[in-house]
Amino acid sequence: SLLHRADAGNMSGIGLTMEGINQNPFIFALMLENVWQDTPVDVDAFLGDYLSCRYGLKDAAPDVKSGITRSWKTLVNSVYSNHTDADGGRQSVMTKRPVFASGPDSLQKPGNFFPLDSLVTAWDGMMNCAGALSGSDGFRYDLVDVTRQVLVELLDRLHYESQEAFYSSDSRMFIQRSSEVLSLMHEIDDLLATRKEFLLGPWVEAAKALGTTPEEKSLYEWNAKTQITLWGKPGSPLNDYACKN
């Protein structure tokens, strides 16, 4: 009814401009679905339609449909169900400024608002469907993204254990965990390099393409790089605001 009002003018719909980098397509699809609803969205029904369209499940075997749906319901009820008062997501050692606990009393165990075993269960289910759904680009992206999160959670725990070993004077464990942290960082980087959505080059070039003059292109390039690094000029009070994990 809003679109057909006499005073609608040039309105043709509603969109989103996020402080983000095109991640979590499920959340934004759900948000836009909710815009035109008078009642709360039936998430289970929406999820079924979403997965059918995103992964092309029309001709998929029943066990594949049920398996991938079960994985996503696990994600919806854990990763996508934050009922805490936390402001923003938890930062990971992978993306925030390098930090090492100043002492044993300042050590903080990594944690999240969702149980890690739920994330791993969802990931395992997706892996079981990988052979059948490998032809879906949407599935391949989601599998990389969920795998990334699983590995990042592991990385943070290894980083914590390296600090714990340091302050326990356990040099052998400190060296082992530190080596594992650095190795896993490279593995996560290799994983993300399989998708253009996680590469710096396409991100910067897409921003530059919006410019019509050399000056505009340079400005947009600066903004694109700033958004994923300092988020402002050097000395900005925003600490790690660009962290996008």
Set out the residue ranges of the language-model regions.
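Substrate-binding groove of N-acetylhexosamine-processing glycoside hydrolases
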Residues: S1-N245
